[in-house]
């Protein structure tokens, strides 16, 4: 029997629901086979308002999968080896690895073009920008991945020699890219002491000149051939060394690990002979990890507050150095004239030996033992500037009165950088 009520209900459902679905227009972006990979990546980023971003590694993984090659599986194994064996590489990212490969692949193509008569202007450029990474093929990965992995291992060993042991203390993760590529390209030529000195100068110019923040792919592309040529004696100073500059007043604003130059200067002090307060030995990897060496105040925070010294001044890198956790506990909040005898007793050394250790940290013993903060501050600032000059080979213009009591500019004292919550503060002793 016909049920008019049910028929009406179905007609209404068809009109109000089904027909609306038929008329609904779904936005579609058509990507043809000839659409460049970088365009696909850009489209995804623009329309994907949620979820995981499609980075260059993800897109290349999909591209390689079309050729039955599992890029992610290969990378995961390499990543595990690199990060398990080298703590300084634990912040390394998959696109860092791809950038290093891209630099080497494009450099090889440029050299091949130049060798067959192309001019410098017409030969393809060296690049590690996204569009160039997306042009990599499975054959490129297979040809270079092992060598680039070895290059990052050599980069890690180079950093250990510079007293940079952990990823947390790495001034610029990005600088790993050209560094690893250089070691790959140089091969055995990069193993000599002379080569390492030249590479180290380039490295410290980049760190202390603070040149590797922001968009730096173009700098990578210049660094690789220019530093390799410098090592091989075929060219003058790389542009990175030429552009590096350190202003003396920058010491006053280096207060936390937010600054690459802060972490770099801390490592530089250890590299150039900073000795452990307790053992008197150079701070090597084992000492660094076993004794939990970290950056601590020389004149303790509690003492500085009592002396009415502003936080922007006592938190500067000028008043900090690498100390073992045990030594820092002995220091507490006491004046240097009080804590130094305790440190000497714990270390089993006399005042003269302790003075030698203090000098290895660019600390003037007489000023520190006399609790003369401003005399210590000015003397240490000058010593630090000399260390920076030695590492970069660049002369720093001095402002002699900048580090004196009552002269430190308010602009430097006020608004200190955000405190690094991971950096331990002194535990005041009663």
PLM features per residue range, with description:
Residues 351-430:
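C-terminal, well-folded lobe of enzymatic/effector domains
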Residues 313, 331-359:
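Polybasic, low-complexity binding patches
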Residues 108-186:
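Structured, charged N-terminal subsegments at the starts of enzyme catalytic cores
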Residues 18-33, 38-42, 79-83, 146-167, ...:
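Short amphipathic alpha-helical segments and their helix-coil junctions
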Residues 207-295, 303:
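Intrinsically disordered, low-complexity N-proximal targeting/linker segments that flank membranes
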Residues 1-112, 116, 166-167, 342, ...:
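Basic- and aromatic-enriched surface patches that contact anionic nucleotides/nucleic acids
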Residues 293, 305-331:
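Short beta-strand-alpha-helix junction that forms the catalytic/metal-binding core
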Residues 42-46, 98-107, 174-185, 200-205, ...:
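Short, hydrophobic/amphipathic alpha-helical patches that form generic packing surfaces
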């Amino acid at each position: 029997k016909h049920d008019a009520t049910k028929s009406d209900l179905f007609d209404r459902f068809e009109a109000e629901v089904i027909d609306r679905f038929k008329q609904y227009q779904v936005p579609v972006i058509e990507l043809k086979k000839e659409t460049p990979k970088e365009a696909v990546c850009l489209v995804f980023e623009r329309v994907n308002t949620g979820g995981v971003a499609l980075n260059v590694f993800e897109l290349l993984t999909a591209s390689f999968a079309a050729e039955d090659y599992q890029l992610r599986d290969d990378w995961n194994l390499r990543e595990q080896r690199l990060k398990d064996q080298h703590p300084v590489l634990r912040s390394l990212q998959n696109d860092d690895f791809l950038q290093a490969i891209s630099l080497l692949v494009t450099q090889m193509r440029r050299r091949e073009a130049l060798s067959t008569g192309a001019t410098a202007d017409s030969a393809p450029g060296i690049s590690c920008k996204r569009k160039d990474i997306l042009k990599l093929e499975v054959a490129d990965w297979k040809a270079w991945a092992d060598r680039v992995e070895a290059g990052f291992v050599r980069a890690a060993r180079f950093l250990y020699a510079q007293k940079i042991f952990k990823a947390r203390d790495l001034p610029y993760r990005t600088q790993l890219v050209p560094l690893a590529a250089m070691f790959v390209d140089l091969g055995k030529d990069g193993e000599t002491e002379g080569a390492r000195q030249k590479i180290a100068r380039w490295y410290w110019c980049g760190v202390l000149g603070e040149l590797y923040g922001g968009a730096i792919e173009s700098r990578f592309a210049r660094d690789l051939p220019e530093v390799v040529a410098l090592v091989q004696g075929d060219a003058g100073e790389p542009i990175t060394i030429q552009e590096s500059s350190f202003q003396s007043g920058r010491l006053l604003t280096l207060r936390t690990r937010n600054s690459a130059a802060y972490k770099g200067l801390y490592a530089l002090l250890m590299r150039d002979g900073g000795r452990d307060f307790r053992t008197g030995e150079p701070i090597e990897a084992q000492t660094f990890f076993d004794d939990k060496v970290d950056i601590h105040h020389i004149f303790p925070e509690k003492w500085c507050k009592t002396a009415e010294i502003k936080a922007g001044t006592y938190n500067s890198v000028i008043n900090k150095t690498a100390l073992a956790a045990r030594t820092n506990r002995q220091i507490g909040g006491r004046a240097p004239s009080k804590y130094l005898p305790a440190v000497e007793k714990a270390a089993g050394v006399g005042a003269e030996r302790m003075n030698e250790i203090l000098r290895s940290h660019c600390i003037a013993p007489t000023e520190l033992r006399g609790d003369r903060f401003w005399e210590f501050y000015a003397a240490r600032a000058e010593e630090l500037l000399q260390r920076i000059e030695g590492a970069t080979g660049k002369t720093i213009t001095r402002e002699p009165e900048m580090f004196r009591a009552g002269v430190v500019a308010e602009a430097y004292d006020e608004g200190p950088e955000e405190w690094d919550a991971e950096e331990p503060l002194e535990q005041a002793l009663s």
